A protein has these predicted regions:
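Active-site beta-loop-alpha junctions enriched in small/polar residues
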Residues: 9-13, 28, 82-86, 106-108, ...
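Non-cysteine beta-strand/loop elements that form the S-adenosyl-L-methionine
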Residues: 24-29, 34, 41, 100-106, ...
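Glycine/Thr-rich beta-alpha phosphate-binding loop at enzyme active sites
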Residues: 105-115, 136, 142-180
């Protein structure tokens, strides 16, 4: 018997589905960013104990939310989102409330962006299945602050930043276990 939920993270969650697993799709920005397939082919590579990628946030964009809302079946898929311009308002107001959403605040393959405490509170209010994806370099105080704002689910973590892209797998597991 498996306790808890098994998650399949991006980029693999975009393409692979198993029974009793939740796929995390994305990460999606509000506006479209072309080149996903080319960047996947170009940058996803096996490395010792894991994978390397430099996909960034190439995605179809969430500005046409109707395209995604049909596939956002409660309990099966979760959409990871990021506001590269730190404007979270369209996500809060346009995504149907109650759907499983992951706020990605820790991607090493793009520039920095932020989210305010007020925006976190709004996401917590409108999305009961909210989770936050963190950086492997996250400060424990930041996790405590998010928890005090109502976040109860944390995705540990995004990839380890390197000059070749983000590294996942065993090297990341060693870092994340210290945060559990």
């Amino acid at each position: 018997m498996i306790l808890g939920m098994i998650y399949i993270s991006p980029p693999f969650g975009n393409y692979i589905s198993y029974k009793n697993c939740k796929r995390i799709k994305g990460t999606l920005t509000w506006e479209k960013s072309r080149g996903l397939i080319k960047q996947c082919i170009k940058t996803i590579r096996p490395v010792k104990g894991g994978w390397c990628n430099a996909i960034g946030f190439r995605n179809p964009g969430m500005s046409n939310i109707k395209r995604f809302s049909g596939s956002m079946r409660r309990g099966r898929d979760c959409y990871s989102i990021a506001a590269l311009d730190s404007n979270w308002s369209p996500f809060i107001t346009q995504i149907p409330h109650g759907l499983p959403i992951e706020i990605n605040v820790g991607c090493p393959n793009v520039g920095s962006y932020t989210i305010s405490d007020d925006d976190i509170r709004l996401f917590v209010k409108h999305f009961s299945e909210l989770q936050v994806k963190l950086s492997p370099t996250v400060d424990l105080d930041y996790i405590k602050r998010l928890h005090s704002l109502g976040v109860r689910n944390f995705h540990l973590s995004n990839t380890i930043p390197t000059d070749r892209g983000g590294i996942s797998g065993y090297p990341l597991k060693r870092i994340n276990l210290t945060l559990v």
